[in-house]
Design a protein with these regions (language model features):
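Low-complexity, acidic/polar, glycine-enriched regions of mature
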Residues: 21-195
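Bacterial N-terminal signal peptides that target proteins for export
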Residues: 1-8
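N-terminal signal peptide c-region/cleavage motif recognized by signal peptidases
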Residues: 16-18
Length: 195
């Protein structure tokens, strides 16, 4: 099983490398973030993130992002471990991906220094499930970089991706009354011109 996962990882990395060769913009992972909020006991909200993201925007407007789920960061090491093992099950599902198509006219407008607010249909692949979402974003550029920022959070329902059982396992092990399965997610993505 681990061999299959390793082979899949190598193939995915090879595909991403080939695709990035045709990229117009490459993700600046150091200055980008995908954040999500967990709400426990119906009153306590905490923000978490992922430390490892890769991605690109292609010349035709095709967008691909890959999230290393093992890089989840909650600022509490034992909680990081529990999310990796009990929620995301990263041995079996090491990454999530986001694919989208952006109208090239939007990229052209932004490349000239404009700012565009729009809604982008995306395909989220998470925990073996693919689902279509609409993400409201603001896109802008300072000439040397492209920024894509959530206009408002997108609500991800854990049950839609087969994660409700993992949320329940986390609730039990932490001794909580509840953890919401409706999870607000925000994007703050910055891309640099591909060489």
């Amino acid at each position: 099983m681990n061999k299959r996962i390793a082979i899949a990882g190598v193939l995915a990395a090879g595909y991403l490398a080939c695709a990035q060769a045709m990229a117009q913009w490459e993700l600046d992972s150091e200055h980008s973030s995908i954040n999500f909020i967990s709400v426990k006991n119906a009153a306590i909200a905490e923000t978490h993130s992922f430390d490892s993201l890769v991605g690109y925007v292609g010349k035709s407007g095709n967008v691909q992002l890959t999230i290393d789920l093992a890089s989840v960061e909650t600022l509490i090491p034992i909680r990081n471990e529990r999310m990796r093992d009990m929620l995301f099950k990263t041995v079996e599902f090491p990454s999530a991906s986001i694919a989208a198509e952006v109208d090239p006219a939007i990229l052209a407008e932004v490349d000239k220094g404009g700012t565009v607010s729009t809604e982008v249909p995306v395909r989220l692949s998470l925990h073996g499930v693919d689902d279509d979402l609409t993400v409201p974003v603001t896109v802008f550029s300072d000439g040397g970089s492209l920024s894509v920022v959530s206009s408002r959070p997108v609500i991800i329902n854990a049950a839609d991706f087969g994660l409700a059982g993992g949320v329940e396992a986390l609730r039990k092990v932490a001794g909580l009354n509840s953890i919401s399965t409706a999870v607000p997610v925000t994007l703050n993505l910055h891309f640099s011109h591909a060489p």
